[in-house]
Amino acid sequence: MTPAENLDSHLRNIIEWHFNPETGCDFWLDWAKNAGWDPRKEVQTFADLDKFPHFEDVWLRDEQNERFVPRGFGDRPFNIFETGGTTGVPKQRIGWDDYKVDYEEFGDNLNDEFFPRSGKWLMMGPTGPRRLRLAIEHLANYRGGSCYFVDLDPRWVKKLIARKQFDEVERYMKHVVDQGVEMIKHRGVQCLFTTPRLLEALAERISIARCGVKGVFCGGTSMTPQMVRFLMEEVLEGKSQFVPTYGNTLMGLACSLPDTLRANNYSVTYWSPQPRAVLRIVDLKDTSKIVDYDEYGRVELTTMTKEFFMPRFLERDEAIRRKPCDKYPWDGVGDVRPFGALEKKVIEGVY
């Protein structure tokens, strides 16, 4: 079965699950009733998803979480994960095991030389109500280790930046980095997850590689080739492996090929975890059209699992459409940056 055939088959199973009155959730069953057509009959290939409108993330804020629970899961308790939001009611996604599937697949692709089995992990970043906290701990456990945590509240940082309280931002960053330094120095940390900004701040205090950190798994809104080169060659001194990822609560995790970064002039391409999620790069003005390879466009995400169906969601990011590769034989997204980054100032805070 080709990747496209596998994707179509997976999609049909997911559509059947979410729009079957016995297994689907109230939200999608009510949506189909109001839309006046049956996705189980009319969606047979991935191209047919264009019959759906773009998923609106405000639905995740305005709807009660229970309306997204598939009837096929019965009364099984669910996790609640938040995404984005600085003020007001946050947007939330419910879940059960998707984060485990995503991060086990990611963990299977980590290099044991740089991310040792049974190694100690440190997560230095947003925990709290985010999926990432459980995901990183599960990743550490899955690979035989345990995980320490240093929490960070990005919502608070964004508020401080918006109020131009930059001294407070610096004090808060120091508070977070101080904790990370102590953990790395005294707990034998070998594997680290953090954001690019925090990684850079850590390196201003200690030599991360000489303190024993062998691998760094990093996530952030945007990482230019210049930033990637700086982090790999200066911050990590060319010694610890740098593994950039692109992910969020709604998608899971899109992986890169860390061993190819130098050969590609530090430009990062990410591939989604198909068939569970698909990333497309669509035209900025006509989102029904996919851009040509090597052109910039807006990132469109479709998530398709039994836990969560989200068609054609327009991310607040733009990227270059990249060609498939041997390991991931489907389109990738490269040089991700905030949507409209060239036209307006975007607050990324500590990412």
Question: Model segments located where?
Answer:
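Nucleotide 5′-phosphate-binding alpha/beta core
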Residues: 1-82, 88-120, 125-129, 142, ...
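Conserved short alpha-helical elements in the N-terminal third of ANL/AMP-binding
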Residues: 133-147
